């Protein structure tokens, strides 16, 4: 009791001292805005001349310098590419001086000042990067509005070190500095967005419209007050509070898709903002919608190596499967956002809400040549899905005793991934090939019989998926700024955060079982309009064909393959969607529950308690030092199912036995030290160094204690609740050169990653093991240290020094080179060639690149703006990378890495071009033209092969053209 009393007395004395300090010293505060458009200037420099005292403006252009002794000072406002201003002020004891600044763009060599949107956007991004306390890349609001990107993922990929994972021809997820999407964190105003994936921790960024964003930040080196689970880095979408006066904008556009030869794409957005009650209350509301055609066509193939090796010992690869695919897909996006802020006498309170939704309607028709099994299949799939993300946040900032800075936040967010209806119908032709072909794609197609009279209904699936992730967060931070004379300033800061996650994954399947046509015919319930082979009791595929033809299929390929069934080299009639729906309605009583998918169901709880302490020191306005440590405790609880399936001759699960609920729990503590050093070498150059430790938690489904034991097929699969968290030491160095004409940076980084997890498949030879003799697939932590080494160059420049009309050119370019090494667990079975021919399993490793790590990345953008006209052409080159399978079946732990390098799968290199042309009409209106994927680039994957790469997929998505109008008021 005495110790508690002494502690309280001590705290009161400290707070009283702070209060006295606040009363004897003063402060200066205000806002900096752009003279051209009245918009706030974030991350501008505000300094007390002749000292190292100063600060930078926040996201809304506000600044505050506290703890000033009474006296006269000169306040300096500076912002790259803008005129520097100096203002004399007098600070009184306990007083507050309000001084706002309106900054103008600086002229070059006597030329008339021409302020363009491109130049303003570039200046904003440069100032943010140069004045940041950590290593960060930025896309400003102005640049976002200048780009033709369809979603936030595409815009993030403009930054150095970022590569895209594409789906439907557009970016959906991002790989940061060679680390796959699951290793990175996505936030809105610092609040983490829940994962949208059904297996891992990745976030689908395609549902976020760029219309609602005020900026995008890519943090490459973490600070102790940031979430620690971001080995690749953190992407933060920023919003802002309302500025003065009623303002708004609206945009509408429509477009054309060259692949589908269809008009009808559209996109629209609207936003309003204003301040009320003497600027005390600010409100921003906005929303938007989009319809996008994401259809595609192409083919995929798989290879086998059953022929063994050639004379040189190289594996012989032959084609086992060829699939021709046409997807007709439309995506609808909806977004809404609102920000309400209240200014207090000594602080502020802000409520923000962001909502995003993507609806996908897809019809896929696929022709499958299964030469390895001597049959051909045609299948039809109709899928409807909805992805939603909602993030609500209430936060406050308060100044206490004139010295302390307190901020707090509470948030609720959720993500959901629902597929309420996925219907798949499959037809099969047995003995589908005239002879054993030479196993090339062309040979397989030529050898196919294409016999419609022997192509019959195999089965129908009707699936539903429901994944939901709810997150609750509370946090508070306390900061104490201090000064040691006029040349040293800094702060100490500490805080805590608690986040609880609850996640549910539920999958259901109804199916007809195999040979459903035979059952229907046996019951005498066949439709009289069907084509039926009564001898074999087959319901023929011709019963489900319609009047729709895909005569343009493969017109963008050198090859000429045909999707529709039939013997002629034409695209015959396609499976009719309405006839598939009618079958589901008329024969609903033939559907039964498929129990195996229940093994994919799980419930997960995750609680993370975090705390940190850090300090920052600035010496002589030259050296900035930040040091601190973060602590995170993770408590996991999972619930799933164990079971043994019984399968038919195709390996399809018929029923389940021995279903048992299983649970798993885990607690893990981790400490994350972090160090940052910034050296301002001159007024136009600085050097930054950082050494930080970060972590990454395993995929949800890897931690779930599910298990399936299939003795009929001699395999078992399971999750691993005791997987270790990954941890990484990250070392960064970046040199920045900046001035009126832009920014040039040279950066390098090195990452050492421990306990990265992969999938191991091995045979169980321990007689005491319950699954003795089976092949077991499970996630394991890899041995050895995985490493990533990278080099980045980033140029953002303008040509204002050139005479008119060439002074309207703006250039952005960045290049990234990456190298990585990781160690994949593999299992080798060795059998003695003499009696008793016993076998042993050798679990070993092989080295290779990190999955998703691209060797080379290049972004180039050249823009021109003059007298209301602007144009920008941009290019993104993305080199090869190990393939990351985003379509892995739930419950199947798959990987893209083979047991030997020749079996590795790769995503091919792509070069993509986009074009934007704009023309202002009067002051408020602007016409624009967007052309995406100018060259209709093919997206391909390969298998490494023994001698040459072998093509495993080849898809095109078409060029899209959009025209529209923007209105600002």
Task: Give the ranges of each region predicted by the language model.
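C-terminal beta-signal and adjacent terminal beta-strands/loops
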Residues: 877-893, 918-969
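N-terminal periplasmic accessory domains that precede
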Residues: 97-102, 152-155, 172-175, 187, ...
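Short, acidic, small-residue-rich periplasmic hinge/interaction motif at the N-terminus
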Residues: 33, 37, 44-49, 78-82, ...
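Outer-membrane beta-barrel signature, preferentially recognizing the C-terminal barrel domain
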Residues: 378-395, 600-607, 666, 695-753, ...
């Amino acid at each position: 009791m005495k110790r508690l009393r002494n502690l309280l007395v001590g705290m009161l004395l400290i707070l009283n001292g702070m209060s006295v300090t606040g009363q004897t010293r003063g402060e200066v505060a205000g806002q900096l805005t752009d003279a051209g458009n009245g918009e706030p200037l974030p991350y501008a420099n505000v300094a007390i001349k002749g000292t190292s005292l100063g600060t930078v403006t926040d996201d809304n252009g506000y600044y505050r310098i506290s703890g000033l002794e009474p006296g006269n000072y000169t306040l300096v406002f500076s912002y790259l590419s803008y005129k520097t201003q100096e203002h004399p002020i007098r600070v009184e004891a306990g007083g507050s001086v309000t001084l706002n600044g309106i900054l103008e763009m600086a002229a070059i060599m006597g030329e008339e000042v021409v302020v363009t949107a491109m130049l303003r956007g570039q200046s904003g991004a440069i100032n943010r990067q140069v004045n940041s306390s950590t290593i960060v890349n930025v896309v400003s609001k102005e640049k976002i509005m200048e780009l033709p990107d369809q979603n936030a993922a595409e815009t993030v990929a403009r930054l150095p070190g970022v590569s895209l994972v594409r789906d439907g021809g557009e970016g959906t997820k991002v790989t940061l500095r060679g680390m796959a999407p699951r290793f990175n964190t996505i936030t809105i105003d610092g609040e983490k967005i829940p994962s949208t994936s059904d297996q891992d921790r990745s976030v689908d960024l395609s549902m976020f419209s760029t219309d609602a964003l005020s900026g995008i930040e890519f943090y490459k080196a973490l600070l102790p007050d940031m979430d620690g689970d971001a080995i690749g880095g953190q992407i933060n979408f920023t919003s802002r509070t309302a500025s003065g006066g009623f303002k708004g904008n609206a945009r509408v556009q429509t477009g054309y898709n060259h692949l589908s030869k269809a008009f009808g794409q559209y996109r629209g957005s609207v936003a309003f903002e204003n301040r009320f009650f003497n600027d005390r209350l600010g409100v921003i509301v906005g929303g938007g919608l989009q319809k996008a055609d994401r259809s595609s066509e192409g083919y995929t193939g798989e290879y086998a190596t059953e022929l063994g090796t050639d004379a040189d010992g190289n594996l012989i690869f032959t084609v086992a499967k060829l699939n021709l695919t046409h997807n007709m897909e439309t995506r609808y996006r909806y977004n809404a956002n609102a920000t309400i802020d209240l200014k207090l006498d000594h602080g502020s309170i802000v409520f923000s809400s962001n909502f995003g939704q993507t609806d996908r309607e897809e019809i896929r028709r696929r022709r499958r040549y299964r030469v390895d099994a001597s049959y051909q299949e045609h299948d039809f799939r109709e899928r409807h899905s909805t992805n939603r993300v909602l993030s609500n946040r209430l936060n406050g900032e308060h100044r206490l005793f004139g010295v302390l800075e307190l901020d707090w936040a509470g948030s609720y967010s959720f993500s959901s991934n629902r597929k309420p209806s996925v219907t798949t119908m499959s037809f099969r032709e047995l003995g589908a090939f005239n002879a054993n072909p030479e196993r090339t794609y062309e040979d397989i197609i030529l050898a196919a019989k294409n016999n419609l009279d022997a192509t019959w209904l195999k089965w129908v699936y009707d699936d539903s998926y429901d994944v939901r992730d709810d997150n609750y967060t509370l946090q508070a931070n306390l900061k104490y700024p201090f000064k040691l004379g006029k040349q040293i300033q800094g702060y100490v800061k500490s805080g805590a955060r608690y986040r609880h996650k609850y996640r549910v994954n539920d999958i259901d399947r109804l199916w007809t079982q195999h040979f459903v046509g035979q059952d229907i015919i046996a019951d005498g319930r066949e439709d009289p309009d069907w084509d039926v082979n009564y001898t074999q009791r087959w319901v023929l595929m011709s019963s489900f064909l319609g009047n729709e033809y895909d005569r343009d299929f493969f017109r963008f390929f050198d090859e000429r393959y045909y999707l529709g069934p039939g013997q002629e080299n034409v695209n015959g009639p396609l499976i009719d969607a309405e006839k598939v729906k009618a079958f589901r309605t008329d024969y609903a009583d033939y559907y039964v529950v498929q129990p195996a998918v229940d093994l994919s169901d799980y419930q997960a709880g995750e609680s993370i308690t975090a705390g940190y302490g850090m300090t920052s020191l600035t010496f002589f306005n030259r050296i900035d030092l930040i040091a601190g440590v973060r602590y995170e405790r993770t408590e996991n609880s999972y619930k799933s199912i164990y079971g043994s399936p019984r399968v038919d001759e195709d390996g399809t699960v018929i029923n389940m036995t021995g279903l048992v609920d299983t649970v798993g729990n885990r607690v893990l503590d981790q400490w994350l030290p972090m160090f940052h050093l910034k050296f301002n070498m001159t007024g136009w150059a600085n050097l930054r160094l950082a050494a930080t430790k970060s972590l990454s938690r395993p995929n949800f489904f890897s931690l779930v204690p599910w298990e399936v034991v299939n003795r009929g097929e001699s395999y078992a699969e399971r999750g691993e609740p005791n997987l270790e968290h990954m941890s990484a030491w990250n070392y960064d160095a970046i040199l920045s050169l900046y001035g009126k004409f832009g920014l040039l940076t040279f950066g390098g980084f090195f990452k050492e990653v421990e306990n990265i997890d992969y999938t191991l498949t091995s045979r169980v030879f321990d007689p005491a093991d319950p699954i003795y003799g089976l092949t077991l697939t499970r996630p394991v932590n890899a041995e050895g240290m995985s490493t990533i080494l990278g080099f980045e160059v980033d140029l953002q420049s303008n040509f204002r020094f050139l005479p008119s009309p060439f002074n309207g050119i703006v250039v952005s370019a960045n290049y990234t080179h990456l190298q990585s090494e990781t160690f994949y667990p593999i299992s080798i079975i060795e059998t003695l060639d003499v009696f008793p021919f016993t076998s042993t399993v050798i679990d070993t490793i092989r080295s290779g690149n990190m999955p998703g790590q691209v060797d080379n990345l290049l972004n180039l953008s050249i823009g021109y703006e003059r007298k209301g006209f602007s144009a920008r052409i941009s290019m993104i080159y993305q080199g090869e990378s190990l393939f990351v399978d985003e379509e892995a079946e739930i419950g199947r732990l798959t990987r893209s890495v083979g047991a030997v390098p020749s079996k590795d799968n790769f995503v091919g290199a792509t070069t993509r071009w986009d074009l934007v042309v704009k023309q202002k009409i009067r002051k408020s209106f602007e016409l624009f033209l967007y052309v995406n994927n100018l060259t209709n680039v093919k997206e391909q994957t390969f298998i490494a092969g023994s001698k040459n790469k072998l093509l495993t997929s080849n898809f095109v998505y078409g060029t899209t053209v959009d025209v529209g109008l923007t209105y600002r008021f």
